[in-house]
Amino acid sequence: MRTHFCGLVDETLIGQTVTLAGWTDVARNQGGVCFIDLRDHEGIVQVTVEVDNAEVFAVAASLGYEDVLQVEGVVRARHAVNDKMRTGKVEVIATAITVLNKAAPLPFHAHENPGEETRLKYRYLDLRRPEMQRMQRTRIKLVQALRRHLDEKGFQDIETPILTKATPEGARDFLVPARMHPGEFYALPQSPQLFKQILMVAGFDRYYQIARCFRDEALRADRQLEFTQLDMEFAFVRERDVQDFVEDMIRGIFKEVVNVELDASFPRMTWAEAMRRYGSDKPDLRIALELVDVAELVKNSEFPVFTGPANDADGRVAALRIPGGASLSRKQIDEYAAHAAKYGAKGLAYIKIADNGEVSSPIQKFFSEESFAALVAHVGAGNGDIVFFGAGGYNKVSDFMGALRLKAGKDFGLVADGWAPLWVTDFPMFEWDEEEQRYVALHHPFTAPAVDDIADLRANARTAVSRGYDMVLNGNEIGGGSIRIHRPDMQSAVFELLGIGAEEARAKFGFLLDALNYGAPPHGGIAFGIDRIAALMAGTESIRDVIPFPKTTGAQDLMTDAPSPIVDAQLAEVHIQVRPKTN
């Protein structure tokens, strides 16, 4: 139906007859001549229809937005060059136009940017927009480049099951009733984690998969119910082997896909250092602001909000200096306090130093003149600055002060241009869940501890460090991995520390424990979020922009109207009866 793509018509074709197909982006009838901007996936070319070709002119004059056309014509040089178009030096003089399909009146035009609900309801129209085409192509190029790199490095692309076993220790599973086994269910995989480990036991050495994963969890801009990850696993490796390989891969992929030169070597930072300096296990290093511990300077003050945590081994009192922050009004300071409260803060103390050196602070009265001056000096505050203080449990203070750091960085224009990758390593093995009164795995239950001795792990579970690692880019965790447990006795011990008894472990993970018993090699791996990396490359904050058919934050597909009710006959086939909703 076509000989050339619209966006690729150029001066080399002048004088030649071409056949094009695409959508009417714009049609303009200027009396003696009609101009049609014809669009396909490669771009736009101007089609010109002259009035002396009466039949073709009549068709052109009747066109509307998004009508689908086939155009035959001769390429000629444009009298008025349009430097804003790739095809701006040429036009196609139409000799025939066939309307392949008329478009109904549109809910929005391809060059408009309507609300997100409208975009998702008419996703097929939204995806025609040039910006959406660009972002989807970025994703496509990313996946193609990853596959090519891994194929060249000897990795094997192996599929793992979509219908699998429900397991604990993660987000909520999506469950699928098993028709042939009444009362029993499959689960959609949250990741291929256990299958890729078993592939290492099976001797495949290097595995990868562009895997679809499913987690029934609350949605936000960077999270979806179903998502795509690059899943990788290596046999006979240590942490640095995995990190060096994927660092080189990510550096090459960014250069190939978006022509970005990442650092020749990514910095490494322990989890403890990241939390201490930045209040986050995924710090955005483009923001130069850092947290400063001040417990030693405030522990003998008369301010009980500070003295309690400052004298508690599990407490923290941290300060954040914001250059130029003295310009904040009382209302704006309250907004910062409200932001911190979302992350667990019960209050936010501050010291504000005006440009003329005048100090205002609700906590100054709790300090001697000397100790207050020492506190100001310790945090490096000067004229024009504000310093926020957080006090409480170590992790909670780190969380809300880290959130303030990000907000301040954006509000005060302190986010540097460019890309800031790093590795965060040495994560805690466990964290204590106050609600359930037990340890939970910080990464997942299959992450190896840094110690090989089970007795040591049991005795020091609270402070145990794992062999986990995350790759962070501009404050986004783009990849997470670890060296895995390959000994069945260690895996059983970790299950036990997580409150998973031997009977439960056998019922839910017996296949893994059995596999580890038959000569499992040391192995490790990593998984990268394709959606998140594509969003960063495309320059959008929402992964929904780089997913062709995403769900809303309300977990709905507005285009297909999913989820939707199921008729009783279908429910009966899978032995399910739905209870009526109750208030």
Swiss-Prot record:
Positions bound to ATP: R215, D216, E217, Q224, E477, G529, I530, D531, R532
Enzyme class: ligase
InterPro entries in alphabetical order: Aa-tRNA-synt_II (IPR004364), aa-tRNA-synth_II (IPR006195), aa-tRNA-synth_II/BPL/LPL (IPR045864), Asp-tRNA-ligase_1 (IPR004524), Asp-tRNA-ligase_1_N (IPR047089), Asp/Asn-tRNA-synth_IIb (IPR002312), AspRS_core (IPR047090), GAD-like_sf (IPR004115)
Presence of the UniProt keyword Protein biosynthesis in the record: yes
Swiss-Prot/TrEMBL keywords: Aminoacyl-tRNA synthetase, ATP-binding, Cytoplasm, Ligase, Nucleotide-binding, Protein biosynthesis
Aspartate: region residues: 193-196
GO cellular component: cytoplasm
The protein's Enzyme Commission number: 6.1.1.12
Annotated catalysed reactions: tRNA(Asp) + L-aspartate + ATP = L-aspartyl-tRNA(Asp) + AMP + diphosphate
Main location: cytoplasm
Gene Ontology biological process terms from the UniProt entry: aspartyl-tRNA aminoacylation
Annotated positions binding L-aspartate: E169, R215, H443, R484
Keyword Protein biosynthesis carried by entry: yes
Any Pfam family the entry gives: GAD
GO molecular function terms attached to this record: aspartate-tRNA ligase activity; ATP binding; nucleic acid binding
CDD domains: AspRS_core (cd00777), EcAspRS_like_N (cd04317)
Compartments reported by the entry: Cytoplasm
Top-level taxon in the UniProt lineage: Bacteria
Subunit-structure text: Homodimer.
Free-text function comment from the UniProt entry: Catalyzes the attachment of L-aspartate to tRNA(Asp) in a two-step reaction: L-aspartate is first activated by ATP to form Asp-AMP and then transferred to the acceptor end of tRNA(Asp).
NCBIfam families cross-referenced by the UniProt entry: aspS_bact, PRK00476.1
Family: Belongs to the class-II aminoacyl-tRNA synthetase family. Type 1 subfamily.
Stated name of the protein: Aspartate--tRNA ligase
Species whose genome carries this gene: Stenotrophomonas maltophilia (strain R551-3)
